A protein has these predicted regions:
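Catalytic centers of hydrolytic enzymes
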Residues: 1-155
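N-terminal propeptides
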Residues: 155-174
């Protein structure tokens, strides 16, 4: 557990509008498909990142090396909690204290209407979940495949390949 949660973070709750959630996801996926440490790890939400569109970089977040989005171009949220996304709704997000304070690309969370650090160690919360909810077992069958919460649309990076090309069969298969 400490290998995947090495920073000693605590569990926080933030309440954000749909628009703030959308900003946070747009900012945290600004360089997708290139990876960064701040890429969102989500549950209870389904969204798409369209990497064929450029990130519309706005102002630099205060005290950060990251820039907020000037406009939302790449991210579309389909559902939150199994319900259609509403930019005007208020959503309750469980996250860590670093992100709740606006760390990495999550500056939108710092201004949340409710921002409360529960003081519970993230590694202990995850251990309790594995022990109590999963009865101590994490299986490949249950957790070994992507859950489909995040779709990354990369478009096609190449033009059509001629049927006479030696690569045609492999590309057609892919």
């Amino acid at each position: 557990i400490n290998t995947v949660l090495p920073f000693g973070n605590t569990l926080s709750i933030v309440k954000v509008t749909g628009a703030e959630l959308l900003e946070a996801l747009e900012a945290s996926t600004y360089c997708t498909p290139t990876s960064i440490g701040g890429f969102p790890q989500v549950s209870g939400i389904e969204f798409t990142v369209d990497t064929t569109k450029a990130y519309d970089q706005g102002e630099q977040y205060p005290g950060s090396t990251y820039y907020g989005p000037k406009s939302i171009q790449r991210v579309t949220i389909e559902t939150v909690g199994g319900e259609p996304f509403d930019a005007n709704a208020t959503y309750t997000i469980a996250t860590n204290d670093f992100m709740a304070a606006g760390g990495d690309t999550y500056y939108a969370f710092a201004a949340a209407s409710v921002n409360y650090d529960l003081g519970l160690s993230m590694d202990e919360v995850v251990m309790d979940y594995i022990t109590d909810e999963l009865k101590g077992t994490v299986t490949e069958e249950a957790y070994g495949q992507p859950a489909g919460r995040i779709t990354v649309d990369q478009g096609l990076a190449f033009t059509d390949v001629a049927a006479t090309s030696p690569y045609y069969d492999g590309i057609e298969w892919a």
